Amino acid sequence: MAADILAGGPSEAAGLPSLLDNLRRPRADIAGLALDRPRTMGIVNVTPDSFADGGRYHARDAAIAHALQLEAEGADILDIGGESTRPGADPVDAEEEWRRVGPVIEALAPRTRARLSIDTRKAEVMRRAAQAGVHLINDVSALRHDPASLETAARTGLPVVLMHAQGDPRSMQDKPHYDDVVLDICDWLGSRIEACEAAGIPRSRLIVDPGIGFGKTLAHNLGLLGCLSLFHGLGCAVLIGASRKSFIGRLTGTADADDRLPGSLAAALIGAAQGVQVLRVHDVAATRQALAVWEGAWRAQASP
């Protein structure tokens, strides 16, 4: 649909009114958060092998302390994950994943005012996390990995992040190919939105994520960053997660993920300038400071 509309294809006449309606429609609050400004989602990896901080917060108490620190820095959402989905990562079963994240969620739910998000591909983990008090589901497979996830996510009543990934973590960087990376991913996400709506999840509860770094080359990632505004045509809130990712290292010659903060801030501001509503980041305080300067300049320009 997106490709037809932008190329003037056969479905243009039928698709253009829908696209314009999606662009104009106000976005619903997400888990009680108004989307009138960019929201920060702080990353809490309760894993031994995540690409940027694997092992640092694997222990329960360390993960809880890290989450509370991110909240103190201004995180609106805390995204808690127990399975690394970095390129080449091995999967873990649902029981092990819950063993990692369950105690952290249960400890944070009564202690934090930030919204809690569960970063998982598994229906059982979604179900248990919802019962434990999370406010949001973030699935890097867009509810495709687990056949039960569509129904489970619908039953929770929670908002869901649908992320694009080509392949699975073990194979996604094996020569990824697209005819047009932006239009292909926009159409793919559109099909996932339709699947969710058919399962009883309304569009107002969906957030789309083009999946920077997941089955993409450097050129693909840069192309997506330059065209993020197109994804608003899907009628959902938009999230990006570019923080510390390897494309920044390839572009700048920065091998250590900890040294990629400047590039991460640049990516966040590129997203904010194109109306992205949620920024998934490791460095909440620095991102909030960068956004404050950007927002201040934007408001000053808009003032009479």
Which residues does each PLM region occupy?
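Glycine-/small-residue-enriched capping loops at alpha/beta junctions
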Residues: M1-A31, V46
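Short, hydrophobic/glycine-enriched beta-strand segments
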Residues: R39-N45
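Catalytic domains of carbohydrate-active enzymes, especially glycoside hydrolases
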Residues: A65-G81, Q274-G275
